[in-house]
Amino acid sequence: MMNNNGFSTGEEDSRGPADQICCLLDDGERCRKQAGNASYSKRIQKTVTQRRLKLSIDSHARHIYICDFHKARIQCARTKRRRRDSEDDSNETDTDLPEVDLYQLQVNTLRRYKRFYKVSTRPSSNKAQLSETIMKHFKTIPIKEKEILTYFIYMVKSNSNKLDQKNNASAEAT
């Protein structure tokens, strides 16, 4: 078995990532998702450190393959950084991303979100601080845009939208 500073050289894993689980620890807990073909390189490790993602490689892992979920999460953090850098250069804001005003929510709702996602805040945070911290977390949640848009288009084309059905029923009644 060839081992290089805790990282696999890949020589001992000729079977590939097909039957392996992700090599990452997510907030101290080993990920149980199936590993894809993306590997946890030093460049990715640097991105994880810079973006303060709570990810690290499991020292007991015999490979460096990561799952698609963590790959997407790391890519999301990387593209957000690029986007912010380019906004700073051009003095423009990203207009195609809608801004959600979490301050409009009740404090109990914000606290419930905080508890559900285990977002750490100061114990005596006021509503403004709480909504700001939650907004930072909210923006880090990865979404599958293609999947969501495909589903939306399918629902519209197949008239499966409940709002469309209500509108058609009221139009037929008149």
Swiss-Prot record:
One of its GO terms (molecular function) is transcription coregulator activity. Keywords: DNA-binding, Metal-binding, Nucleus, Repressor, Transcription, Transcription regulation, Zinc, Zinc-finger. It is found in: Nucleus. InterPro entries: His_deAcase_SAP30/SAP30L (IPR024145), SAP30_C_sf (IPR038291), SAP30_Sin3-bd (IPR025718), SAP30_zn-finger (IPR025717). GO terms for biological process: regulation of DNA-templated transcription. GO terms for cellular component: histone deacetylase complex. A zinc finger (Atypical) spans 22-70. It comes from the Eukaryota. The keyword Disulfide bond does not apply. Its main location: nucleus. Required for the function of the class 1 Sin3-histone deacetylase complex (HDAC). Belongs to the SAP30 family. Component of the class 1 Sin3-histone deacetylase complex (HDAC). This is Histone deacetylase complex subunit SAP30 homolog. The lineage of its organism: Eukaryota, Metazoa, Ecdysozoa, Arthropoda, Hexapoda.
